[in-house]
C-alpha cells in the first residue's frame, strides 16, 4: 500500500463502517431502466432505497430522506417536474443530494433540466467524463450513456464545477476522479479500483450516484476524523464520496475474481457489496493525489 493510499485508508474504513451503521434512507429519482438494480445495490451496501417520483410526493419525501439522488437517465414529464421540487426541498431541509446528469449534451430536454438542477446547490455531482464536461459547458456530451472523453481530459471541467457550485465532483472511468474546492483551493484525487466488466453491467454508474447520496448523509459524522492524525486532510463530503467509490470499486475487484462474464459478475458484485467490511474495502483500493 502506498503512503498516499495509506493516509486515506483509515478514513475510508471509518466512512464505510459509519454508513453501514447508519442505514441511510436514499430517495431515488432515477431512470426507469435501473430502478431495480439501484434498490438491490443500496440494500447490499447497507442502505435503504425509496423510489418516490410523483410530483405531489417527491418534495415531501426528500425532506425526510437521509439523502436524495436526482438522475436524468429518463426524463418523463412527471420526472422533469419532480426532480427540481425534490432538490429544492432537500436543500431547504439540509438533506444532501446528488446530481447524476446522465446522457446530457446532445439531448435538449435532459441537458436543460441538468443545468437547471445545477443551480439548486447539489452536494455532489457524478458522471462520466463526457457528461461532466457537458455540464460544465466544456464539451458536447458522449454517445448516450457512454463517454467519448477521457477522465483525464475532464479534470478542468470537474474543477470548474466544484469551484462554481461547492459540490464534490466525481468523474467515473477506468480510474475515478474526485474533485472538490477546499477553502478556495481545488483538490483532486485518483481512485484506482473496480473491474473491466463493470461497464458491461447495467446500472453500475447510476447505482453509484444513489450510494453516494447515502454516504453523503453521514458526512457530519465524519468531521471528528480530522482530529485523527491517521486520516488524510480531506473534507468530510469528499471523504464520503471517495468512500462510496471505494466501496463500489472494491466490490468490483472481488466480483471479477469470482465471475468471468457480465451476468454472473452482476450477482457476484452485489454479493461483494454486502460482504466486504470497511477494512477490506480500504485495503483493495489505491488513492493518489491529482494535480488540479
Regions found by a protein language model. Give the residues of each.
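Active-site cofactor/substrate anionic-group-binding motifs, chiefly glycine-
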Residues: 41-93
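Short, small-residue alpha-helix embedded
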Residues: 134, 202-231, 236-246
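General beta-strand structural signal in soluble alpha/beta enzymes
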Residues: 28, 50-52, 97-101, 125-129, ...
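Glycine-rich phosphate/adenosyl-contacting loop at the front of the ribokinase-like
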Residues: 1-51
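Charged C-terminal helix
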Residues: 7-10, 225-232, 249-292
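Short pre-catalytic strand/loop immediately N-terminal to key active-site residues, enriched for Gly-Thr
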Residues: 191-204
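Conserved phosphate/ATP/ADP-binding segment of small-molecule kinases
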Residues: 109-188
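Glycine/small-residue-rich loop that forms an oxyanion/phosphate-binding "nest" at active or ligand-binding sites
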Residues: 79-128
Amino acid at each position: 500500500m502506498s503512503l498516499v493510499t495509506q493516509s486515506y485508508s483509515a478514513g475510508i474504513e471509518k466512512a464505510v463502517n459509519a454508513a453501514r451503521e447508519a442505514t441511510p434512507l436514499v430517495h431515488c429519482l432515477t431512470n426507469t431502466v435501473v430502478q431495480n438494480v439501484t434498490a438491490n445495490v443500496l440494500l447490499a451496501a447497507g442502505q435503504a432505497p425509496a423510489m418516490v417520483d410523483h410530483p405531489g410526493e417527491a418534495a415531501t419525501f426528500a425532506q425526510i430522506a437521509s439523502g436524495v439522488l436526482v438522475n436524468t437517465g429518463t426524463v418523463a414529464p412527471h420526472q422533469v417536474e419532480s426532480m427540481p421540487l425534490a432538490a429544492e426541498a432537500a436543500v431547504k431541509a439540509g438533506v444532501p443530494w446528488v446530481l447524476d446528469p446522465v446522457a446530457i449534451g446532445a439531448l435538449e430536454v435532459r441537458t436543460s433540466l441538468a443545468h437547471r438542477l445545477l443551480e439548486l446547490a447539489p452536494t455532489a455531482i457524478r458522471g462520466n467524463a463526457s457528461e461532466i464536461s457537458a455540464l460544465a459547458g466544456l464539451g458536447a456530451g458522449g454517445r448516450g450513456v457512454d463517454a467519448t472523453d477521457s477522465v483525464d481530459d475532464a479534470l478542468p471541467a470537474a474543477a470548474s464545477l466544484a469551484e462554481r457550485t461547492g459540490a464534490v465532483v466525481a468523474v467515473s472511468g477506468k480510474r475515478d476522479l474526485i474533485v472538490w474546492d477546499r477553502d478556495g483551493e481545488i483538490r483532486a484525487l485518483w481512485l484506482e479500483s473496480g473491474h473491466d466488466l463493470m461497464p458491461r453491467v447495467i446500472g453500475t454508474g447510476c447505482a453509484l450516484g444513489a450510494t453516494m447520496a447515502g454516504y453523503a448523509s453521514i458526512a457530519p459524522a465524519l468531521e471528528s476524523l480530522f482530529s485523527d492524525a491517521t486520516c488524510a486532510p480531506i473534507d468530510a463530503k469528499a471523504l464520503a464520496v471517495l468512500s462510496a467509490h471505494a466501496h463500489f470499486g472494491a466490490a468490483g475487484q472481488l466480483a471479477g475474481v469470482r465471475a468471468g462474464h457480465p451476468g454472473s459478475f452482476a450477482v457476484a458484485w452485489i454479493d461483494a457489496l454486502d460482504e466486504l467490511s470497511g477494512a477490506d474495502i480500504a485495503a483493495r483500493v489505491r488513492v493518489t493525489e491529482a494535480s488540479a
